[in-house]
Amino acid sequence: MNAKVVVVLVLVLTALCLSDGKPVSLSYRCPCRFFESHVARANVKHLKILNTPNCALQIVARLKNNNRQVCIDPKLKWIQEYLEKALNKRFKM
């Protein structure tokens, strides 16, 4: 085989092997880029706390009335109280 063909073939195969998975820009993106700050506690069916190494605290709520998922601002007073109560319950001796 011609040396140029071998080099091109090796480069193409290397590029294919390195391109597996998501692009770096997508794999490090935080799930919650925008927060809802006017979500009533009574309207929340379920809360999910996302723990990602490269993002701040992120809380996703499933709403009762339309089953929609929204990211809730973790600075809301009722969220702070909920988290404090959950942590106290978990680490209570």
UniProtKB/Swiss-Prot annotation:
Effect listed in the UniProt record for changing residue 22 to A: Loss of chemotactic activity
UniProt motif (Receptor activation motif) ranges: 22-23
The organism's place on the tree of life at top rank: Eukaryota
UniProt site positions, description: Important for dimer formation: 46
Residues covered by region (Receptor and heparin binding): 29-33
Outcome recorded upon mutating residue 70 to A: Impaired CXCR4 activation
Effect of residue 45 to S: 55-fold reduction in binding affinity for Link domain of TNFAIP6
GO MF annotations in UniProt: chemokine activity; chemokine receptor binding; CXCR chemokine receptor binding; growth factor activity; integrin binding; signaling receptor binding
Effect ascribed to mutating residue 46 to L: No significant effect on dimerization in neutral pH. Eliminates the pH dependence of dimerization
Tissues where this protein is expressed: Isoform Alpha and isoform Beta are ubiquitously expressed, with highest levels detected in liver, pancreas and spleen. Isoform Gamma is mainly expressed in heart, with weak expression detected in several other tissues. Isoform Delta, isoform Epsilon and isoform Theta have highest expression levels in pancreas, with lower levels detected in heart, kidney, liver and spleen.
Binding site for heparin: 41-51, 62, 69, 85
GO CC term (a single one): external side of plasma membrane
Result of changing residue 62 to Q: Slightly impaired CXCR4 activation and clear resistance to inhibition by heparin
Consequence recorded when altering residue 48 to A: Impaired CXCR4 activation
Post-translational modification: Processed forms SDF-1-beta(3-72) and SDF-1-alpha(3-67) are produced after secretion by proteolytic cleavage of isoforms Beta and Alpha, respectively. The N-terminal processing is probably achieved by DPP4. Isoform Alpha is first cleaved at the C-terminus to yield a SDF-1-alpha(1-67) intermediate before being processed at the N-terminus. The C-terminal processing of isoform Alpha is reduced by binding to heparin and, probably, cell surface proteoglycans.
Resulting phenotype, residue 81 to A: No effect on CXCR4 activation
Residue segments, region Receptor binding: 39-41, 48-50, 60-70
Role: Chemoattractant active on T-lymphocytes and monocytes but not neutrophils. Activates the C-X-C chemokine receptor CXCR4 to induce a rapid and transient rise in the level of intracellular calcium ions and chemotaxis. SDF-1-beta(3-72) and SDF-1-alpha(3-67) show a reduced chemotactic activity. Binding to cell surface proteoglycans seems to inhibit formation of SDF-1-alpha(3-67) and thus to preserve activity on local sites. Also binds to atypical chemokine receptor ACKR3, which activates the beta-arrestin pathway and acts as a scavenger receptor for SDF-1.
Protein name: Stromal cell-derived factor 1
Organism: Homo sapiens (Human)
Gene that produces this protein: CXCL12
